UniProtKB/Swiss-Prot annotation:
This is DNA-directed RNA polymerase subunit alpha. InterPro entries: DNA-dir_RNA_pol_insert, DNA-dir_RNA_pol_RpoA/D/Rpb3, DNA-dir_RpoA, RBP11-like, RNAP_asu_C, RNApol_insert_sf. Homodimer. The RNAP catalytic core consists of 2 alpha, 1 beta, 1 beta' and 1 omega subunit. When a sigma factor is associated with the core the holoenzyme is formed, which can initiate transcription. It is an enzyme of class 2 (transferase). The gene is rpoA. DNA-dependent RNA polymerase catalyzes the transcription of DNA into RNA using the four ribonucleoside triphosphates as substrates. It comes from Rickettsia felis (strain ATCC VR-1525 / URRWXCal2) (Rickettsia azadi). Pfam families: RNA_pol_A_bac, RNA_pol_A_CTD, RNA_pol_L. Residues 246-340 are annotated as: Alpha C-terminal domain (alpha-CTD). Coiled coil: none annotated. GO terms for biological process: DNA-templated transcription. It comes from the Bacteria. Belongs to the RNA polymerase alpha chain family. GO terms for cellular component: cytoplasm; DNA-directed RNA polymerase complex. It catalyses: RNA(n) + a ribonucleoside 5'-triphosphate = RNA(n+1) + diphosphate.
Length: 340
C-alpha cells in the first residue's frame, strides 16, 4: 500500500530559492520560490508567515527601574512625557543580545536634551539596533537615571504575564516583543514548467529589525516547521534500488537536463530563460527559425547552442514523443546520473 501512496518524490519541487535584498537596507528581502505544485504556494506561504511572526527567538527590554518611581501612573520630574509614555517609547527600542542570560543596561542624562536609545550604556553583550529612537525629552538642569533589563525570548509577552512574578519594588515590567521579524507578506503567482503554465510561484517579502538577516529568519522558520511536521511521519521508508534503466524512456535522457546547467553565455542563457525554455527537451523541439524569432536571440547564440546540442547527438527541430512528461521533475532527478 505504501508503494502506491508514495508520491512525494513525484511532486514537483522548487529548483532553488532566490533572495533579493533591497538596495537601501539588508533588513528587507524578496524571496521567490518556484515551481511549486498548485496550492502549495498558499500552503507554504501561510505556514511560513505564521512561524516567522510568532516563533523566532530574539531579545527585548522586559522591565525598567527609575529612582523614586514605583509604577507607570507617575510623572518624572523634568521629563515632558509621563511614565506610561516613556514605557511606550522604550517598547520601540530594538535590541540584539549575544548571550542568553539577562543583562541590565543603564541610562544617565542631564538636560536639556532629547534622550534617545543610543544614549543607553549597553556593554559588550547587547546592541541597540535603532539608536536614534526617541525615549523622552528632558528639561534644562534636570537629570534622569534609569536601569533597563534586557532578556532573550520569543513572541510577544505581556507585562502581566511576565515570567518574573516577584520583581523588586520600583521595577516596572513592560510588554516585550521578542520577535526579530517586523513584517511578512506573500503572494502567489503562476509559473511555467515546460508547457504547463499553472504551477505556483511563491513570493515573500520579509523585514527584520536587524537582529537577523531575512535569509536566516526564513531558514530558521523552515527548520521549525520541519521539526514539527517530522512527528507526523508514522512509517519507515525502505532503501530502494536507485539504478534506473535508461532504455525505459521513449526519448534520450539528455532531454531531461536543465538548460541552466549548460555552459552558455549570459546572453543565450537569458534568452532561453525569458522564453520559458527549462529543459533541453523544450529546446530541441524548437526549430532554428523559432529560435531566431526569440527577442535578442541572434545567429551567434544559435550557433553556440547548436554546438552544445551536437555533443549530445541532439539538434533543433526534433520530434520528441510524449514530451513533456507529467512527472518531468521526478524523471530529471532519477536520470541525473545518466546525463552528468
Amino acid at each position: 500500500m505504501l508503494s502506491l501512496s508514495k508520491n512525494w518524490n513525484t511532486l514537483i519541487k522548487p529548483n532553488k530559492v532566490a533572495y533579493e535584498n533591497f538596495p537601501e537596507t539588508n533588513n528587507k528581502a524578496k524571496i521567490v520560490v518556484e515551481p511549486l505544485e498548485r496550492g502549495f504556494g498558499l500552503t507554504l506561504g501561510n505556514a511560513m508567515r505564521r512561524v516567522l511572526l510568532s516563533s523566532l527567538q530574539g531579545a527585548a527590554i522586559t522591565s525598567i527601574k527609575i529612582p523614586a518611581i514605583e509604577h507607570e501612573f507617575s510623572s518624572i520630574p523634568g521629563v515632558k512625557e509621563d511614565v506610561s509614555e516613556v514605557i511606550l517609547n522604550i517598547k520601540g527600542i530594538e535590541v540584539k543580545m549575544h548571550v542568553a542570560e539577562k543583562r541590565i543596561m543603564k541610562l544617565k542624562a542631564t538636560g536639556p536634551c532629547v534622550i534617545t536609545a543610543g544614549m543607553i550604556e549597553t556593554g559588550h553583550d547587547v546592541e541597540i539596533l535603532n539608536p536614534d529612537h526617541v525615549i523622552c525629552n528632558l528639561a534644562k538642569n534636570k537629570q534622569l537615571e534609569m536601569e533597563l533589563t534586557c532578556k532573550v525570548g520569543k513572541g510577544y509577552v505581556l507585562s502581566t504575564n511576565s515570567y518574573e512574578d516577584n520583581l523588586p519594588i520600583g521595577e516596572i515590567a513592560i510588554d516585550a516583543l521578542f520577535n526579530p521579524v517586523k513584517s511578512v507578506t506573500y503572494k502567489v503567482e503562476n509559473t511555467r514548467v515546460g508547457q504547463v503554465t499553472d504551477y505556483d510561484k511563491l513570493i515573500m517579502f520579509v523585514e527584520t529589525n536587524g537582529d537577523l538577516l531575512p535569509e536566516m529568519a526564513v531558514g530558521l522558520a523552515a527548520r521549525i516547521l520541519q521539526e514539527q511536521l517530522q512527528l507526523f511521519i508514522s512509517f519507515e521508508e525502505q532503501e530502494e534500488d536507485k539504478q534506473v534503466k535508461t532504455d525505459a524512456l521513449p526519448f534520450s535522457p539528455y532531454l531531461l537536463k536543465r538548460v541552466d546547467e549548460l555552459e552558455l553565455s549570459v546572453r543565450s542563457a537569458n534568452c532561453l530563460k525569458n522564453d520559458n525554455i527549462i529543459y533541453i527537451g523544450d529546446l530541441v523541439k524548437r526549430t532554428e527559425s523559432d529560435m531566431l524569432r526569440t527577442p535578442n536571440f541572434g545567429r551567434k547564440s544559435l550557433n553556440e547552442i547548436k554546438e552544445i546540442l551536437a555533443k549530445f547527438n541532439l539538434r533543433f527541430g526534433m520530434d520528441v514523443p510524449d514530451w513533456p512528461p507529467e512527472n518531468i521533475q521526478e524523471l530529471s532527478n532519477r536520470y541525473e546520473d545518466s546525463y552528468n
